[in-house]
Protein backbone atom coordinates (compact mmCIF):
# COMPACT_ATOMS: atom_id res chain seq x y z
CA UNK A 1 0.00 0.00 0.00
CA UNK A 2 1.42 3.34 -1.00
CA UNK A 3 1.28 6.65 0.80
CA UNK A 4 -1.52 8.10 -1.33
CA UNK A 5 -4.10 10.82 -1.68
CA UNK A 6 -7.71 9.92 -2.33
CA UNK A 7 -7.20 9.51 -6.07
CA UNK A 8 -5.48 6.15 -5.52
CA UNK A 9 -8.65 4.66 -4.08
CA UNK A 10 -9.73 4.12 -7.68
CA UNK A 11 -7.28 1.23 -7.88
CA UNK A 12 -9.33 -0.88 -5.50
CA UNK A 13 -12.98 0.03 -6.00
CA UNK A 14 -15.44 -2.81 -5.62
CA UNK A 15 -18.82 -1.53 -6.81
CA UNK A 16 -21.95 -3.63 -6.92
CA UNK A 17 -24.48 -3.80 -9.73
CA UNK A 18 -22.24 -2.16 -12.33
CA UNK A 19 -23.37 -4.58 -15.04
CA UNK A 20 -26.43 -2.37 -15.60
CA UNK A 21 -25.91 -0.20 -18.68
CA UNK A 22 -28.13 2.58 -17.30
CA UNK A 23 -25.78 3.72 -14.58
CA UNK A 24 -24.68 7.07 -13.27
CA UNK A 25 -21.41 8.35 -11.85
CA UNK A 26 -20.40 9.15 -8.28
CA UNK A 27 -17.19 10.93 -7.32
CA UNK A 28 -15.57 11.31 -3.93
CA UNK A 29 -13.06 13.99 -2.92
CA UNK A 30 -11.34 15.03 0.30
CA UNK A 31 -10.81 18.52 1.72
CA UNK A 32 -9.48 20.17 4.86
CA UNK A 33 -10.81 23.56 3.77
CA UNK A 34 -12.63 25.41 6.55
CA UNK A 35 -16.36 25.76 6.05
CA UNK A 36 -17.80 29.24 5.56
CA UNK A 37 -19.34 28.85 9.01
CA UNK A 38 -18.53 26.01 11.44
CA UNK A 39 -21.03 23.20 11.07
CA UNK A 40 -23.05 22.45 14.23
CA UNK A 41 -21.19 19.72 16.06
CA UNK A 42 -19.58 18.85 19.36
CA UNK A 43 -16.40 20.51 18.12
CA UNK A 44 -17.90 23.99 18.42
CA UNK A 45 -20.37 25.57 20.82
CA UNK A 46 -22.52 28.61 20.12
CA UNK A 47 -20.47 30.67 22.59
CA UNK A 48 -16.96 29.74 21.44
CA UNK A 49 -14.91 31.62 18.87
CA UNK A 50 -13.87 29.60 15.84
CA UNK A 51 -10.16 29.54 14.99
CA UNK A 52 -9.08 31.38 11.86
CA UNK A 53 -7.45 29.37 9.08
CA UNK A 54 -4.91 30.73 6.59
CA UNK A 55 -3.14 29.02 3.70
CA UNK A 56 0.64 29.49 3.91
CA UNK A 57 2.21 27.85 0.87
CA UNK A 58 1.88 24.11 1.34
CA UNK A 59 0.96 24.43 5.04
CA UNK A 60 -2.15 25.47 6.96
CA UNK A 61 -2.01 28.09 9.75
CA UNK A 62 -4.62 27.85 12.52
CA UNK A 63 -4.85 30.84 14.88
CA UNK A 64 -6.91 31.52 17.98
CA UNK A 65 -6.05 34.44 20.25
CA UNK A 66 -2.28 34.70 20.74
CA UNK A 67 -1.64 31.05 19.89
CA UNK A 68 -1.22 29.31 16.55
CA UNK A 69 -0.54 25.95 14.94
CA UNK A 70 1.14 25.46 11.57
CA UNK A 71 0.19 22.08 10.12
CA UNK A 72 2.77 20.85 7.62
CA UNK A 73 1.43 17.35 7.05
CA UNK A 74 -1.68 15.44 8.10
CA UNK A 75 -2.38 11.81 7.27
CA UNK A 76 -5.24 9.52 8.23
CA UNK A 77 -5.80 5.79 7.76
CA UNK A 78 -9.31 5.05 6.49
CA UNK A 79 -11.09 1.86 5.52
CA UNK A 80 -14.60 0.67 4.60
CA UNK A 81 -15.50 3.94 2.87
CA UNK A 82 -19.08 3.57 1.63
CA UNK A 83 -21.88 5.82 0.37
CA UNK A 84 -25.09 4.71 2.10
CA UNK A 85 -28.43 4.42 0.32
CA UNK A 86 -31.48 6.04 1.90
CA UNK A 87 -33.26 2.73 2.54
CA UNK A 88 -30.36 1.05 4.37
CA UNK A 89 -29.86 1.30 8.12
CA UNK A 90 -26.15 0.52 7.93
CA UNK A 91 -23.77 -0.48 5.15
CA UNK A 92 -22.37 -3.28 7.31
CA UNK A 93 -25.86 -4.69 7.81
CA UNK A 94 -26.07 -6.08 4.28
CA UNK A 95 -23.85 -8.94 3.18
CA UNK A 96 -22.18 -8.09 -0.11
CA UNK A 97 -22.98 -4.39 0.26
CA UNK A 98 -25.27 -4.32 -2.79
CA UNK A 99 -27.13 -1.45 -1.11
CA UNK A 100 -24.07 0.74 -0.54
CA UNK A 101 -21.53 2.10 -3.01
CA UNK A 102 -18.20 0.85 -1.71
CA UNK A 103 -15.16 3.04 -2.32
CA UNK A 104 -12.59 1.17 -0.27
CA UNK A 105 -12.55 -1.84 2.05
CA UNK A 106 -8.91 -2.21 3.09
CA UNK A 107 -6.71 0.16 5.04
CA UNK A 108 -5.78 3.20 2.94
CA UNK A 109 -3.48 6.06 3.91
CA UNK A 110 -4.82 9.43 2.75
CA UNK A 111 -2.96 12.73 2.89
CA UNK A 112 -5.12 15.75 3.70
CA UNK A 113 -4.75 18.70 1.29
CA UNK A 114 -3.16 21.66 3.08
CA UNK A 115 -2.24 25.24 2.26
CA UNK A 116 -3.35 26.50 -1.13
CA UNK A 117 -4.46 23.00 -2.16
CA UNK A 118 -8.13 23.07 -1.23
CA UNK A 119 -9.24 19.66 -2.41
CA UNK A 120 -7.71 16.29 -3.19
CA UNK A 121 -8.02 15.08 -6.76
CA UNK A 122 -11.34 13.41 -7.35
CA UNK A 123 -12.09 9.88 -8.46
CA UNK A 124 -15.23 9.00 -10.41
CA UNK A 125 -16.79 5.55 -10.63
CA UNK A 126 -19.90 3.97 -12.11
CA UNK A 127 -22.87 3.63 -9.76
CA UNK A 128 -26.45 2.44 -10.20
CA UNK A 129 -29.19 5.08 -9.81
CA UNK A 130 -30.37 5.70 -6.27
CA UNK A 131 -30.72 8.11 -3.38
CA UNK A 132 -27.94 8.38 -0.81
CA UNK A 133 -27.97 9.94 2.65
CA UNK A 134 -24.56 9.48 4.27
CA UNK A 135 -20.92 8.52 3.91
CA UNK A 136 -19.80 5.74 6.22
CA UNK A 137 -16.14 4.99 6.95
CA UNK A 138 -13.73 3.95 9.66
CA UNK A 139 -10.78 5.82 11.09
CA UNK A 140 -8.66 2.71 11.32
CA UNK A 141 -5.77 1.70 13.57
CA UNK A 142 -3.85 -0.90 11.53
CA UNK A 143 -3.05 -4.16 13.30
CA UNK A 144 -0.37 -6.72 12.51
CA UNK A 145 -2.98 -9.47 12.21
CA UNK A 146 -5.26 -7.68 9.70
CA UNK A 147 -3.00 -5.20 7.93
CA UNK A 148 0.45 -6.77 7.66
CA UNK A 149 1.01 -5.64 4.05
CA UNK A 150 -0.15 -2.09 4.82
CA UNK A 151 2.15 -1.82 7.84
CA UNK A 152 5.09 -3.19 5.84
CA UNK A 153 4.56 -0.38 3.32
CA UNK A 154 3.80 2.25 5.99
CA UNK A 155 5.79 1.31 9.12
CA UNK A 156 5.09 4.67 10.80
CA UNK A 157 1.43 3.64 10.99
CA UNK A 158 1.77 0.41 12.95
CA UNK A 159 -1.09 0.75 15.50
CA UNK A 160 -1.39 4.43 14.47
CA UNK A 161 -4.39 5.86 12.59
CA UNK A 162 -3.42 9.56 12.42
CA UNK A 163 -0.11 11.41 12.09
CA UNK A 164 0.27 15.21 12.00
CA UNK A 165 3.46 17.29 11.99
CA UNK A 166 3.92 21.01 12.40
CA UNK A 167 4.74 23.86 14.76
CA UNK A 168 2.86 25.06 17.84
CA UNK A 169 3.25 28.66 19.00
CA UNK A 170 2.02 29.84 22.41
CA UNK A 171 2.36 33.58 22.99
CA UNK A 172 5.26 33.67 20.53
CA UNK A 173 7.17 30.64 21.85
CA UNK A 174 7.44 27.99 19.15
CA UNK A 175 7.96 24.25 19.33
CA UNK A 176 7.82 21.57 16.66
CA UNK A 177 5.51 18.62 17.19
CA UNK A 178 4.59 15.23 15.83
CA UNK A 179 1.10 14.17 16.86
CA UNK A 180 -0.07 10.57 16.53
CA UNK A 181 -3.33 8.94 17.51
CA UNK A 182 -4.66 5.41 17.71
CA UNK A 183 -8.31 6.43 17.30
CA UNK A 184 -10.19 3.41 15.93
CA UNK A 185 -13.72 4.56 15.25
CA UNK A 186 -16.61 4.03 12.84
CA UNK A 187 -17.98 7.29 11.47
CA UNK A 188 -21.12 8.32 9.63
CA UNK A 189 -21.17 11.73 7.95
CA UNK A 190 -24.77 12.51 7.03
CA UNK A 191 -25.36 14.54 3.88
CA UNK A 192 -27.24 17.83 4.54
CA UNK A 193 -30.00 16.52 2.27
CA UNK A 194 -30.47 13.23 0.40
CA UNK A 195 -28.55 13.11 -2.88
CA UNK A 196 -29.82 11.27 -5.94
CA UNK A 197 -27.91 9.69 -8.81
CA UNK A 198 -29.90 9.38 -12.03
CA UNK A 199 -28.95 7.17 -14.95
CA UNK A 200 -26.40 9.02 -17.05
CA UNK A 201 -25.91 11.75 -14.43
CA UNK A 202 -23.26 12.35 -11.77
CA UNK A 203 -23.08 13.01 -8.04
CA UNK A 204 -20.08 14.77 -6.49
CA UNK A 205 -19.51 14.18 -2.78
CA UNK A 206 -16.73 15.74 -0.69
CA UNK A 207 -15.63 14.62 2.76
CA UNK A 208 -14.41 17.56 4.84
CA UNK A 209 -11.98 17.09 7.73
CA UNK A 210 -12.30 20.20 9.90
CA UNK A 211 -8.67 20.39 11.06
CA UNK A 212 -9.21 23.78 12.70
CA UNK A 213 -11.16 22.11 15.51
CA UNK A 214 -8.83 19.24 16.26
CA UNK A 215 -6.62 21.01 18.79
CA UNK A 216 -9.17 23.03 20.74
CA UNK A 217 -9.32 22.65 24.51
CA UNK A 218 -12.33 21.17 26.26
CA UNK A 219 -14.06 24.55 26.53
CA UNK A 220 -13.36 25.29 22.83
CA UNK A 221 -11.77 28.61 23.82
CA UNK A 222 -8.06 28.03 23.13
CA UNK A 223 -5.61 25.90 21.20
CA UNK A 224 -3.64 23.17 22.95
CA UNK A 225 -0.18 21.90 22.09
CA UNK A 226 -0.77 18.93 19.75
CA UNK A 227 2.12 17.12 21.45
CA UNK A 228 0.08 17.14 24.67
CA UNK A 229 -2.55 15.01 22.90
CA UNK A 230 -0.20 12.11 22.19
CA UNK A 231 -0.70 8.76 23.92
CA UNK A 232 -0.97 9.36 27.67
CA UNK A 233 -0.92 13.15 27.28
CA UNK A 234 -3.15 15.54 29.20
CA UNK A 235 -5.22 16.38 26.12
CA UNK A 236 -5.38 12.94 24.50
CA UNK A 237 -9.10 12.35 25.10
CA UNK A 238 -10.12 15.94 24.30
CA UNK A 239 -8.39 15.90 20.92
CA UNK A 240 -9.60 12.37 20.12
CA UNK A 241 -13.16 13.54 20.70
CA UNK A 242 -12.59 16.63 18.54
CA UNK A 243 -11.28 14.45 15.72
CA UNK A 244 -14.25 12.12 15.83
CA UNK A 245 -16.59 15.13 15.48
CA UNK A 246 -14.68 16.84 12.67
CA UNK A 247 -16.05 15.08 9.59
CA UNK A 248 -18.77 16.42 7.29
CA UNK A 249 -19.94 15.10 3.92
CA UNK A 250 -21.79 17.17 1.33
CA UNK A 251 -22.56 17.58 -2.35
CA UNK A 252 -19.85 19.63 -4.03
CA UNK A 253 -20.93 20.45 -7.56
CA UNK A 254 -18.25 23.15 -7.90
CA UNK A 255 -15.43 20.81 -6.81
CA UNK A 256 -14.08 23.55 -4.50
CA UNK A 257 -14.34 21.94 -1.07
CA UNK A 258 -17.42 24.00 -0.14
CA UNK A 259 -21.01 22.85 0.03
CA UNK A 260 -23.06 23.47 -3.08
Residue ranges and their predicted role:
Residues 19-260:
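A short, solvent-exposed, low-complexity linear motif enriched for acidic/polar residues
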Residues 14-17:
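C-terminal motif of bacterial Sec signal peptides marking the signal peptidase cleavage site
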Residues 1-7:
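Bacterial N-terminal signal peptides that target proteins for export
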Amino acid sequence: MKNVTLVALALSFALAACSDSNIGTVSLALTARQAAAPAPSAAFSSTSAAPSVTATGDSTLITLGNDSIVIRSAQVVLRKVELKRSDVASCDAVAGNDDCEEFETGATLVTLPLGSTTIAQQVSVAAPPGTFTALEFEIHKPSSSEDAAFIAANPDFAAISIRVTGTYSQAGTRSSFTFTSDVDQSEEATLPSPATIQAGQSLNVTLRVELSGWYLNGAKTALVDPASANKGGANESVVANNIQNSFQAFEDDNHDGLEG
